[in-house]
């Protein structure tokens, strides 16, 4: 069956949502060989994925993932990765700021693939627990307001695609659908996208999948974050409506900075800069890029009515050390209490 779907793609046809779903289910059950998976990913990348295909692939991925049975509303700040900019972990820092203001954050992430430092790598360097089970993650959400959902734990069926992805070495559709498959089924997200051409497709896909409020952001300097050194293209899905606009740091009283001031070479440098930001002693560009991204996330979460209000809330959380106190809370180890 996979051969037939592959042949259809090679002949220039696109897959229906149902066919894409079937293809993904076969990949995740080990029915497709490594070379077939590599061919499939290469063809989709070359011609571009349709919304039907993206929807089918995400539905299958969600079908096979381990879910977090968490009833309260939570937000995710996650990116496609692969922007090649080697920045510190901005979305992780923003997640800490957002969670310090009472918003539950189910942070979906992984180890570094193309970047210098994945969110799992930097959290380990900072001695912040990565929850090993859904039960631990639920407890962390309840007691600390932030849980880290380590992607390989929740998406174990993706193991069959690991080798072909590594061997072909370029970004594939899996970079796009990973952030759309949060185990907590977050309906509110900020998703950093490495290329703005994909943002509208992803917004339409999320609309079909029932998301409520999602902002897909791409810096004009190529960042898969809201940038401090350039304008940022935003595609917003809100209650079924999709609109596109551009934001700039100056709109929110933030000075335009330099990209090199938020770049790092190692996991340790990323961890040190993230900690310095929350302590308020980092460079202005690093502090402001976290404030901007946290502000956008607070808006997506519904905590703030506008991005401007979200930015002001994030500034205050930084100035009052509320964000740093949350950082220290996350680093505290839980002590088991026995009756």
From Swiss-Prot:
Free-text cofactor note: Binds 2 magnesium ions per monomer.
Enzyme class: transferase
Record: residues binding 5-phospho-alpha-D-ribose 1-diphosphate: 79, 82-83, 87, 89-92, 107-115, 119
Source organism, top-level taxon: Bacteria
Transmembrane segments annotated in the record for this chain: none
Gene Ontology terms: biological process: L-tryptophan biosynthetic process
Purpose: Catalyzes the transfer of the phosphoribosyl group of 5-phosphorylribose-1-pyrophosphate (PRPP) to anthranilate to yield N-(5'-phosphoribosyl)-anthranilate (PRA).
HAMAP family assigned: TrpD (MF_00211)
Subunit structure, interactors included: Homodimer.
Protein name: Anthranilate phosphoribosyltransferase
The organism's taxonomic lineage, starting at the top: Bacteria, Bacillati, Bacillota, Bacilli, Bacillales
Gene: trpD
